[in-house]
C-alpha cells in the first residue's frame, strides 16, 4: 500500500456530515430564490437543481434542518416527498423520488425557514431591520434544501426579494423591479458559501475593484480602515498564486453579533465590526479573507475532516501577503534589506499564531488537535478552533522549509491551485500532488523526511518551527524585565508607558499574551496586577478587540477580582457588545475560571439573545448549559 493510499484510508471516502446522496449526482447548475420577511422573521424560497445522475438511483436525498418544505417537483411534475425525522446535528433528510432511467433532470423545491434556523439571524441594525446568514459549516441546510457538503460545488444564479438592500454570493446583475435583486456566480461554489444579507446598506470604494458595504453610520470608518491596503493585497496575492478570478472583491461589515472575524463569501466577504479599530492593525483579516479566494473558494476541502486544506493554506497565503506588504513599505521608507524585513514580519505573525496554537492544544479536546479529523458522529462546529489554521500553516511552512524555501515552494503554489481549481480534494490528494511535483525535481528524499503520520493524524503540537524572532525579541526583553522584577520582590514599580512606545500593533499583543503566560509560573501579587492600568493606560483605554481581550485576560486571571469589581463588570459588559466567537468563548471561560461559574452564566443569560445561534450554542456547551 502506498503512503497516499494509506492516508486516504485513514479518513472517510464520503463526507460523514451530510445526509445527502451527493456522490450519485453531478450538480450542473443551481437557481436559488429567497424572499425576506422582516415581519415574520423568516426567509421563504425556491431552489432548482439541474442534475446529471452518476448512478441508476431512483431517489434524491437533500440535507435540510428545521425547514418547512411545501412542494417538490421533478422535471416540472409535482412528486410526493418524505421529510425524515430530525437528528442532531445533521438535520432531516429530504427524500425525493426520481426516475431511475433518465440521466439528466431538474428538481425544484419550495421551502421556508423556521425560528429554529441556525443559519440566519434577524436583528435590529443601527438604522433599521437587518438579517444576515452564516452557513459554515453545516448550516446551509437550515436555509435551503441542499447537498450540504464542501464536496459538491455548483455555479449559481441568485434572486433575492426584500424591502431593504440585499447582497448574496455573486456578482450583482441589473434588475427592473423594485425590491428584487439578481446575482450571478459562474464559478462553482459549495453550499457553505451561499449567503444572503439584507438591511439599510450603503457602499463606498476601497479600491478599483473593491467596495465596502455597511450601514451608514460606520461607512466612513470602514472605508478608511481598508482603502490603504485593499488593492495592494489583491495584486500581491495575484503574484503569489495567479490572477484573481472573481471579478470584484467587495466586502460587507456586519453587525456586532456576527460570530466570526470574517467569512469568505465570494464577491462579498463578510467582516466583523471588531476590525474597525481605527488604527489599521487588523487588516490582516482582510488579507486572510482575500486569500480564501484561492484557498477554500477556488480549491476546497472535500469534507470538514480536511478543513486544514482550506484554512492552513489561507493562513499561509495571508502571511505571505502581509510579509510582502511590509517589504514594499520598508523599501518606500528606505530601510536596508526590505526583503529581509518582510520575512521577519511574516515570521513574527507566525510566532503570534504559534502561541495561539500552543494555547489551543493545551485547552482543546485532543481528538480535534490533529490536522485530519474523524467527524463520523460529531458536529464540525465542535471541532472548530485555531488548529486547522495554525497547525495547517505550520505544516505548509515545514514543507516550504524542506523543499528549500519560498523560491522552491512558490512554483508548487501555482501548480496546486491550477490543478485543483473548481474542485474539492482530500489530504491524500494534496500529498500525492506534492510528490508528483517535487519527485522529478530531485526532492523526494527531502519530502520523505516529513513525518506525515505525525503531522496529519496525531494530536498535539508539532516540533517547534524555530521562527525568526528578531521582531519578537524586543518584546521578550521587556517581558524578562517584568519577570525579574516580580522575582526580586521589589515594591517600587519602575515601568511606564514609555516601555511600549515603539511597539507596533502585533508587538503589543505579543507583549500582553507573553506576560500572561510567564506570570502563571510566578507568585504575582494581585496588588501589582491592579496597578497595570495606571502603568500602561493605553492598553486600559484600547478599543482594539485584540488588545482588549488579551489585556482583560491578564488582569482578571491574576488580579483576584470579584464580580463586584469594575474591571470585571467592564469586561462582562463588553462581552455583550461583541459576537465574535474568538472573543466571546474565551471570555466566558475566563469569567468561569477566574471569577465564578455563577457570574459567567448570569452574564451569558443577560446577553444570549444578542448572539448568533452558532455562538449561543457553543457558549452553552462551554458553560455546560447544553
UniProtKB/Swiss-Prot annotation:
Reaction(s) catalysed by this chain's protein: an epoxide + H2O = an ethanediol
Chief subcellular location: cytoplasm
PROSITE patterns in alphabetical order: ZINC_PROTEASE
Keyword Kinase: no
Keyword Ion transport found: no
Subcellular location per the Swiss-Prot or TrEMBL entry: Cytoplasm; Nucleus
Active site: 289 (proton acceptor), 389 (proton donor)
Cofactors, names only: Zn(2+)
Keywords tagged on the record: Cytoplasm, Hydrolase, Metal-binding, Metalloprotease, Nucleus, Protease, Zinc
Matching InterPro entries: Aminopeptidase_N-like_N (IPR045357), Aminopeptidase_N-like_N_sf (IPR042097), ARM-type_fold (IPR016024), LTA4H (IPR012777), LTA4H_cat (IPR049980), M1_LTA-4_hydro/amino_C_sf (IPR038502), M1_LTA4H (IPR034015), Peptidase_M1 (IPR001930)
Residues bound to substrate: 134-136, 259-264
PANTHER family in alphabetical order: LEUKOTRIENE A-4 HYDROLASE
Homology family: Belongs to the peptidase M1 family.
Protein's name in the database: Leucine aminopeptidase 2-1
Organism: Scheffersomyces stipitis (strain ATCC 58785 / CBS 6054 / NBRC 10063 / NRRL Y-11545) (Yeast)
Name of the gene this protein is made from: LKA4
Amino acid at each position: 500500500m502506498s503512503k497516499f493510499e494509506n492516508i486516504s484510508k485513514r479518513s472517510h471516502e464520503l463526507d460523514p456530515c451530510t445526509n445527502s446522496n451527493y456522490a450519485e449526482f453531478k450538480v450542473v447548475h443551481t437557481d436559488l430564490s429567497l424572499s425576506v420577511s422582516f415581519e415574520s422573521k423568516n426567509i421563504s424560497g425556491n431552489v432548482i437543481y439541474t442534475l446529471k445522475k452518476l448512478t441508476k438511483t431512483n431517489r434524491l436525498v437533500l440535507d435540510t434542518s428545521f425547514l418547512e418544505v411545501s412542494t417538490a417537483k421533478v422535471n416540472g411534475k409535482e412528486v410526493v416527498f418524505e421529510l425524515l425525522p430530525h437528528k442532531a446535528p445533521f438535520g432531516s433528510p429530504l427524500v425525493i423520488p426520481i426516475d431511475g432511467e433518465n440521466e439528466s433532470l431538474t428538481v425544484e423545491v419550495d421551502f421556508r425557514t423556521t425560528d429554529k434556523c441556525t443559519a440566519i439571524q434577524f436583528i435590529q441594525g443601527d438604522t433599521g431591520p437587518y438579517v444576515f446568514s452564516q452557513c459554515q459549516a453545516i448550516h446551509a441546510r437550515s436555509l435551503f434544501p441542499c447537498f450540504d457538503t464542501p464536496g459538491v460545488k455548483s455555479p449559481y444564479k441568485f434572486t433575492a426579494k426584500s424591502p431593504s438592500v440585499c447582497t448574496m454570493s455573486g456578482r450583482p446583475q441589473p434588475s427592473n423591479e423594485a425590491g428584487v435583486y439578481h446575482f450571478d456566480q459562474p464559478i462553482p461554489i459549495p453550499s457553505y458559501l451561499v449567503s444572503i444579507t439584507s438591511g439599510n446598506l450603503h457602499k463606498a470604494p476601497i479600491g478599483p475593484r473593491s467596495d465596502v458595504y455597511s450601514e451608514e453610520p460606520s461607512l466612513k470608518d470602514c472605508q478608511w480602515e481598508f482603502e490603504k491596503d485593499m488593492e495592494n493585497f489583491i495584486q500581491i496575492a495575484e503574484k503569489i498564486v495567479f490572477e484573481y478570478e472573481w471579478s470584484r472583491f467587495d466586502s460587507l461589515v456586519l453587525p456586532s453579533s456576527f460570530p466570526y472575524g470574517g467569512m469568505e463569501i465570494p464577491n462579498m466577504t463578510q467582516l466583523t465590526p471588531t476590525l474597525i479599530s481605527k488604527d489599521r492593525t487588523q487588516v490582516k483579516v482582510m488579507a486572510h479573507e482575500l486569500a480564501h479566494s484561492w484557498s477554500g473558494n477556488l480549491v476546497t476541502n472535500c469534507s470538514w475532516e480536511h478543513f486544514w486544506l482550506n484554512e492552513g493554506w489561507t493562513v499561509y497565503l495571508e502571511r505571505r501577503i502581509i510579509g510582502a506588504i511590509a517589504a514594499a513599505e520598508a523599501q518606500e521608507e528606505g530601510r536596508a534589506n526590505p526583503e529581509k524585513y518582510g520575512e521577519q514580519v511574516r515570521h513574527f505573525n507566525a510566532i503570534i499564531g504559534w502561541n495561539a496554537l500552543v494555547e489551543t492544544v493545551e485547552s482543546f479536546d485532543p481528538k480535534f488537535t490533529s490536522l485530519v479529523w474523524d467527524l463520523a458522529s460529531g458536529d464540525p462546529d465542535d471541532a472548530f478552533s485555531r488548529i486547522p489554521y495554525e497547525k495547517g500553516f505550520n505544516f505548509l511552512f515545514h514543507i516550504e522549509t524542506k523543499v528549500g524555501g519560498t523560491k522552491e515552494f512558490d512554483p508548487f503554489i501555482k501548480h496546486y491551485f491550477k490543478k485543483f481549481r473548481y474542485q474539492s480534494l482530500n489530504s491524500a490528494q494534496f500529498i500525492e500532488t506534492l510528490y508528483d511535483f517535487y519527485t522529478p525535481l530531485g526532492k523526494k528524499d527531502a519530502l520523505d523526511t516529513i513525518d506525515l503520520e505525525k503531522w496529519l493524524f496525531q494530536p498535539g503540537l508539532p516540533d517547534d518551527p524555530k521562527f525568526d524572532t528578531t521582531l519578537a525579541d524586543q518584546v521578550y526583553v521587556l517581558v524578562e524585565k517584568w519577570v525579574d522584577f516580580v522575582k526580586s520582590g521589589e515594591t517600587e514599580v519602575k515601568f511606564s508607558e514609555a516601555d511600549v512606545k515603539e511597539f507596533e500593533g502585533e508587538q503589543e499583543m505579543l507583549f500582553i499574551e507573553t506576560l500572561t503566560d510567564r506570570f502563571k509560573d510566578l507568585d504575582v501579587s494581585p496588588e501589582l496586577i491592579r496597578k497595570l492600568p495606571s502603568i500602561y493606560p493605553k492598553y486600559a483605554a484600547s478599543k482594539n478587540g485584540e488588545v482588549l481581550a488579551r489585556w482583560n485576560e491578564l488582569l482578571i486571571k491574576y488580579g483576584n477580582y470579584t464580580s463586584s469589581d469594575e474591571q470585571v463588570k467592564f469586561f462582562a459588559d463588553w462581552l455583550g457588545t461583541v459576537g465574535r466567537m474568538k472573543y466571546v468563548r474565551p471570555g466566558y471561560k475566563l469569567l468561569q475560571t477566574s471569577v465564578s461559574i455563577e457570574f459567567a452564566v448570569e452574564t451569558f443569560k443577560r446577553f444570549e439573545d444578542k448572539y448568533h445561534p452558532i455562538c449561543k450554542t457553543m457558549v452553552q456547551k462551554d458553560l455546560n448549559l447544553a
